[in-house]
Design a protein with these regions (language model features):
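Conserved NAD(P)H cofactor-binding loop of Rossmann-fold oxidoreductase domains
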Residues: 53-59
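C-terminal helical subdomain
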Residues: 139, 146, 154, 163-197
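A short, exposed helix-loop element centered on a Lys and neighboring polar residues
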Residues: 86-87, 131
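Rossmann-fold cofactor-recognition segment
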Residues: 13-29
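The beta1-alpha1 cofactor-binding region of Rossmann-like NAD(H)/NADP(H)-dependent oxidoreductases
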Residues: 3-4, 24-35, 68
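Substrate-binding pocket helix/loop in short-chain dehydrogenase/reductase
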Residues: 61-63, 70-72
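Catalytic loop of short-chain dehydrogenase/reductase
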Residues: 56, 94, 99-125, 130-139, ...
């Protein structure tokens, strides 16, 4: 979420013998997103995997009390940023032998609980977008899916439940293998929302 966080991740990758290219990008600035595809095309020529994981919670409030700017922010990050990312990255994903796209979603999209209007609606829109993109890539080697990882220990979870939730949280490390499985070359799923236990 920050340049410092990216640099710390880069250090971890290098410490285990890997290498990374850092491309800081503010997803709230949609015009900046459009530059990502050409930059990656110039450097790499293709993209094998895109994980759309960024998200914001937005206000947990009655829908009539949520300000327009807050609705716009939630939809900009949770939905429109992913649309723009797919648009700029699509040619690179198609250039891959087996392009993979996975979005992080939530069962909140289907449950639509009270006070979660912005988040629920934005994730519902993302799910529909994922299924549409999957239908458009049906006759390719690409696989487009979404994962609902369940309750994971993240800053967003802390924001949603400041006193701590009444249910057990998974760690990000506990769900990473599920993400790796869905972006693997042998992944059979396409256009699916995979709900983790």
């Amino acid at each position: 979420r920050t340049t410092g966080g990216l640099e710390a991740l880069d250090d971890k990758i290098r410490n285990v013998g890997g290498k990374a290219t850092l491309l800081p990008l503010n997803l709230a600035h949609l015009d900046e997103i459009d530059k990502l595809g050409p930059t990656l095309a110039e450097r790499f020529g293709r993209l094998d995997i895109f994980v759309g994981n960024a998200g914001v919670l937005g206000p947990l409030s009655p829908v009539g009390h949520i300000k327009a700017k807050d609705w716009e922010k939630v939809f900009k990050i949770n939905f429109m940023a992913n649309v723009r990312l797919v648009q700029t990255l699509d040619p690179l994903l198609r250039a891959s032998e087996a392009g993979r796209v996975v979005f992080t979603t939530s069962d909140i999209a289907d449950e639509a609980p009270a006070y979660w209007g912005g988040y629920a609606a934005s994730k519902s829109a993302l799910n529909t977008f994922m299924r549409t993109y999957a239908a458009e890539t049906e006759k390719t080697n690409m696989r487009i899916n979404a994962i609902h990882p369940g309750a994971v220990q993240t800053a967003m979870m802390t924001e949603a439940f400041p006193g701590g939730p009444s249910f057990k949280l998974k760690t990000p490390e506990q769900v990473v293998n599920d993400y790796l499985a869905i972006v693997a070359n042998n992944c059979p799923h396409h256009g699916q929302i995979i709900k983790l236990p």
